[in-house]
Amino acid sequence: MTAILERRESESLWGRFCNWITSTENRLYIGWFGVLMIPTLLTATSVFIIAFIAAPPVDIDGIREPVSGSLLYGNNIISGAIIPTSAAIGLHFYPIWEAASVDEWLYNGGPYELIVLHFLLGVACYMGREWELSFRLGMRPWIAVAYSAPVAAAAAVFLIYPIGQGSFSDGMPLGISGTFNFMIVFQAEHNILMHPFHMLGVAGVFGGSLFSAMHGSLVTSSLIRETTENESANAGYRFGQEEETYNIVAAHGYFGRLIFQYASFNNSRSLHFFLAAWPVVGIWFTALGISTMAFNLNGFNFNQSVVDSQGRVINTWADIINRANLGMEVMHERNAHNFPLDLAAVEAPSTNG
């Protein structure tokens, strides 16, 4: 008997690289989306840290009145932020090489655009990487679908809203108090609290946290004990065990008697789909609401909508909100314009002279 041995061709360097990138045996999965995600998120994070610590003041309103945002220029963790790119730049793509000098680039808020654009690309690739890993492992794609909600929200406040308003200076500052300022100004200019899509988002976030707490407490309260009374019930679980770890029948019975029978899920798959879908759909709607308000399709306006038989206004809470909106609007960008847009839009009376 004769055995013929053939020499196996060695795999090319590119082939080995492809196998390493797409291998699910790596401690952290990279994937083709990861090839773009890693450098973009590293860039965004590095520039954010450096700018948060040391960036000079930025002329956000384009009126030669720089606003300080970094720690070395007098801020703390709460008040510090990456100041958005100047209104003088508008929506122009503003990389370092477009400025006459690095000082000019910093003065006009170039780091904000750099961070935001790299960050959005990075989180979009993170979402793609979630789908890619799910695909390689033979899983369904819903993890990436769920993550699309925060990606949509980030895109709405960092990209869609500035596009609608005509300038990156209207984007959300990258800091704690800057975020609050963005929220207050957004309410003043768009009446977001009276927008039904924002209401759906609030229901999604608060409802999601409520349902999460209810589910976690029900499961924890109906564990199948595998240990003695002297040991923690948590110690009875083995990773990968085939047996159920809690009694869904007991949990269903408890909750059905606490509220009513049909308020409780008796199907674990339906339950977990609901837990995922509720907050995700709510945040989708909020992102959609921000994106519509970006183009000034604002919240409901019920100002002075209730009057008596004599035509006199009977104030409602909508009028109280409107008064607060006017107060917030006259306080922000106080040197950029003399009157809020609502008042400035009124046609001036003609004079005979």
UniProtKB/Swiss-Prot annotation:
Chlorophyll a PD1 binds at H198. The keyword DNA-binding does not apply. The record marks A344, A345 as: Cleavage. The chain crosses the membrane at residues 29-46, 118-133, 142-156, 197-218, 274-288. This is Photosystem II protein D1. It comes from Nandina domestica (Heavenly bamboo). Chlorophyll a ChlzD1 binds at H118. Photosystem II (PSII) is a light-driven water:plastoquinone oxidoreductase that uses light energy to abstract electrons from H(2)O, generating O(2) and a proton gradient subsequently used for ATP formation. It consists of a core antenna complex that captures photons, and an electron transfer chain that converts photonic excitation into a charge separation. The D1/D2 (PsbA/PsbD) reaction center heterodimer binds P680, the primary electron donor of PSII as well as several subsequent electron acceptors. Tyr-161 forms a radical intermediate that is referred to as redox-active TyrZ, YZ or Y-Z. Keywords: Acetylation, Calcium, Chlorophyll, Chloroplast, Chromophore, Electron transport, Herbicide resistance, Iron, Magnesium, Manganese, Membrane, Metal-binding, Oxidoreductase, Phosphoprotein, Photosynthesis, Photosystem II, Plastid, Thylakoid, Transmembrane, Transmembrane helix, Transport. GO terms for biological process: photosynthetic electron transport in photosystem II; response to herbicide. InterPro entries: D1/D2, Photo_II_D1/D2_sf, Photo_RC_L/M, Photo_RC_L/M_CS, PSII_D1. It catalyses: 2 a plastoquinone + 4 hnu + 2 H2O = 2 a plastoquinol + O2. One of its GO terms (cellular component) is chloroplast thylakoid membrane. Pheophytin a binds at Y126. The modification N-acetylthreonine is found at T2. It is a multi-pass membrane protein. [CaMn4O5] cluster binds at D170, E189, H332, E333, D342, A344. Its EC number is 1.10.3.9.
